[in-house]
Amino acid sequence: MATGGVMDPISDYRVQELSDAQMARAVEDAHRAGHKVMAHAEGTVGIKAAIRAGVDSIEHGTMLDEESAKMMAERGTWLVPTLYCFQHDLKTGLSKGREPSSMAKGIAIVKEQGPAFRRALKYHVKIAYGVDDDDIDESVSKEFGALVQGGMTPLEALQAATIHGAELLSLDKDLGTIEPGKFADFVAVPTNPLDDITVMEHVAWVMKSGVVVKPLS
């Protein structure tokens, strides 16, 4: 937790929670053990601290400014923007029991989300796909549309969820593309997602290790 969160009633997303030294030590120890480090980071100060500490990816990055976007691009730090979760929470949060104070924070920070994401695209920050929501099934499919609305092409959004996610996790030897020798894990949709990315919300079937596990019903 490089910063506080948004959809909780207590913490402040603008405040750096761990010190620079604590983050650097956590990253050092994790990397020594061969693990990746992802930092929850909303506010600008915490984002920059996490980048300096050497994390592999920034989760959310909602207040990414020009300087931090440049830092990420220069250091090869990934961004997992989770665009849809904030948009969804603002629509459903109160009905799910979110505190009014949390909703107020969400309304404030969602205004930062679009400009921050466009800065990441401007500086060619590496972007991988991810979600962060109570309604995980919906978020997984609708994040594609949010990425495209945010400025990505449909192809870039698909790559974020496939080869780029695999590269971030150093799993691209086995995952991320369809080619001989890799795991046969993929989904099928009714039409070409390059023409309409929202078809990713309508999966026809899922294949896992070469076996169809979710046929069209």
Role assignments for model-derived ranges:
Residues 2-111, 128, 134-135, 167-169, ...:
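Active-site core of metal-dependent hydrolases
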Residues 32-36, 97-100, 109-192:
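His/Asp/Glu-enriched, well-ordered alpha-helical/loop segment
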Residues 195:
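Small/polar (Gly/Ser/Thr/Ala-rich) solvent-exposed segments
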Residues 199-201:
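Short, small/polar residue-rich loop motifs at catalytic or cofactor-binding pockets
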